[in-house]
Amino acid sequence: MTRQLLSQMVENNEGHIINIGSTAGIYAYAGAAVYAATKSAVKVLSDGIRIDTIDKNIKVTTLQPGIVETDFSQVRFHGDKERAATIYQGIDALQANDIASCTLFVANQPAHVQISDITIMATKQATSFT
């Protein structure tokens, strides 16, 4: 999507790109090396775009959520709901609306304020997997 919109933002001399990464891009975990690498790349790509467009009034933000209760774990574990449920044991996982609230917070800052990144975790989460 950024590829499609960035040229228009440059032409208009304004815009805001908000990319969704993951704490897995900060804290890798077993069995997810490729996923962690791609999420790390989201942050680096965002930083690069911010640098490349610094004179164009384009903000670039990376949101890096931790454990969010979605279908992600069921997909990861090929439909094994019991195994997927273990991911959330003992953690009051983030919900999609928590990420949406952070996105709105970032998007609604004054023109002179750029939030480069936010890492969002559940209260009982310390890394991408605990």
Feature map (PLM): residue ranges:
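Active-site helix of classical SDR
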Residues: 2, 38
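Active-site-adjacent segment of SDR/Rossmann-fold oxidoreductases
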Residues: 4, 8-9, 27, 48-58
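Residue(s) in the substrate-gating loop at a strand-loop-helix junction
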Residues: 22
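Conserved SDR Rossmann-fold cofactor-binding beta-strand/turn motif
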Residues: 59-69
